[in-house]
């Protein structure tokens, strides 16, 4: 069985302990798994603004009493895999976001130089060398350890099937960032909350942001960036994220059409 298929049915460890979150509303416990660059910061702000008690999976390891054995409502939130990949590049690479997300380089001059070289790559280099060729190679056990150098950064472009226990969770709701304005009212009502409750739209940038693109949404730049890639690269990216595309009914068509229009 292929690794990604096996991961759909069995997950020995939760891969992303800092975005998988238990939260409580009116004596009911719920759970959301959302990926990095897939709206996780917006949910953090939503919990804080509405004083919703929440506990990350990472904190459950320290005190299992903080986390329930079962959840009333289980949620997975996703985003188009290619839009999320570009959002990752803009944040970590173009705008230098990697510097504040991995402190290991601060005490290791060689690692710092390696990271500077890696995260200075152009968009086509990132796609070809880092994603397709897997230049930032980290063993799977180390990748599941968020304190291992580079693992937290690489998780930003890890597929959904790897990050969330997709089928094991049996989610009650699958939210998409693209349809969130329509999805949220239904979800909020299921929580017993007002359907028009404000949900923040948080866009995280890095310390090197020169604001050449402003704090604008990534979808505005899809054509600018993906038109720099070859058909082979886009198809190879699709192979890497194929399970995510098929699971959540996303399409590659418009990305291929961009190349045909050039």
Regions found by a protein language model. Name each.
Residues 1-262:
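Membrane-interface amphipathic segments in extracytoplasmic regions
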């Amino acid at each position: 069985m292929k690794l990604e298929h096996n991961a759909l049915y069995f997950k020995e460890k939760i891969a992303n302990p800092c975005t998988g979150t238990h939260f409580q509303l009116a004596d009911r416990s719920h759970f959301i798994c959302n990926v990095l660059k897939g709206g996780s910061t917006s949910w953090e702000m939503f919990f804080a603004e509405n004083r919703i008690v929440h506990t990350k999976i990472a904190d459950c390891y320290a005190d299992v009493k903080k986390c329930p054995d079962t959840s009333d409502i289980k949620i997975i939130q996703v985003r188009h895999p290619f839009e999320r990949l570009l959002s990752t590049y803009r944040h970590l690479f173009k705008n230098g976001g990697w510097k504040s997300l991995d402190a290991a380089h601060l005490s290791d001059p060689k690692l710092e130089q390696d990271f500077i070289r890696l995260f200075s790559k152009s968009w086509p280099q990132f796609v070809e060398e880092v994603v397709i060729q897997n230049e930032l190679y980290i063993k799977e056990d180390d990748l599941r350890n968020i304190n291992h150098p580079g693992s937290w950064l690489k998780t930003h472009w890890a597929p959904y099937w790897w990050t969330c226990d997709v089928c094991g969770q049996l989610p009650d709701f699958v939210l998409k960032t693209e349809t969130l304005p329509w999805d949220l009212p239904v979800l909020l009502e299921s929580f017993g909350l007002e359907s028009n409750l404000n949900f923040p739209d948080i866009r995280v940038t890095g310390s090197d942001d020169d604001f050449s693109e402003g704090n604008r949404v990534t979808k505005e730049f899809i054509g600018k960036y993906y038109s720099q890639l070859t058909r082979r690269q886009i198809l190879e990216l699709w192979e890497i994220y194929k399970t995510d595309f098929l699971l959540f009914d996303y399409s590659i068509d418009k990305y291929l059409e961009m190349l045909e229009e050039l």
